[in-house]
Structures are given as structure tokens and as C-alpha cells.
Amino acid sequence: MAMPLKWEFPGGKIKPGETPEHCLCREIAEELAIKVAVHHALAEKTHAYPEFTITLYPFVCTIISGTIILREHAAVIWLPREELASLDWADADRPVLEAYLQFAGQETP
């Protein structure tokens, strides 16, 4: 899904027989050339855009190896938690951000 000029979390489509966790690890390796460890699942979020509906399966992860190389994205940014809400997020990703900030003990503005 491409949302020009909007920030999105990395990820992609789940393949048949693949778990959401495995999908995320595979997609991050493909898109960013890094390996992550999945630590905590957040509640799935479904959003209806005018053209399609998407369900996101968010996870809290850490990078365990590699250096980020952008293979499919135009930009990447690493911010402190308290600055994440200042970005212009895609509509489907905003509830994921809110869930993450609640998990991390932050309030969203």
C-alpha cells in the first residue's frame, strides 16, 4: 500500500500459511535489510479506506542485526516515542501508533 507523503510502519501482506509474526520479520528483512526480534503483539487494527480495507497486526520489536537499507521506502526516521505523534501518519497507522504509545506508557496528543 502506498500513501504518498504519509508515514507508515513497515510491513506487508501475509502469505498463505504464514503467521503475522513471520510475515513482519520477512517483510522487514525484504524492505529494510535488517533482522528483528518480535517481543509483544499489540491488538490488530482494521481501517476502511474508500478503495479497500486493511487489517494491521502490529508488534513491538527490536533490531537484532543488520544496517537499515531502504529497498522499498523513500525515507526512514528514528524518533523518541514522545515525537512520533508529530508525524503525518497514514490513517490506518494512527491507531497502531496510539496502541504503541499506550503500551509504552505515553499519552497521544
Could you say what each language-model-derived stretch is?
Residues M1-E30:
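Conserved Nudix-box catalytic region and its N-terminal flanking loop in Nudix hydrolases
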Residues I69-P109:
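Nudix hydrolase/Nudix homology domain
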Residues E31-V38:
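Short secondary-structure junctions
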Residues I14-K15, H47-A48, E83-A85:
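Short histidine/acidic/glycine/proline-rich micro-motifs that form metal-
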Residues K35, E44-T67, I77, Y100:
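Active-site-adjacent beta-strand/loop module that shapes the phosphate/pyrophosphate-binding cleft
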Residues P20, L24-A29, A41, F59, ...:
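Hydrophobic packing within well-folded, soluble alpha/beta domains
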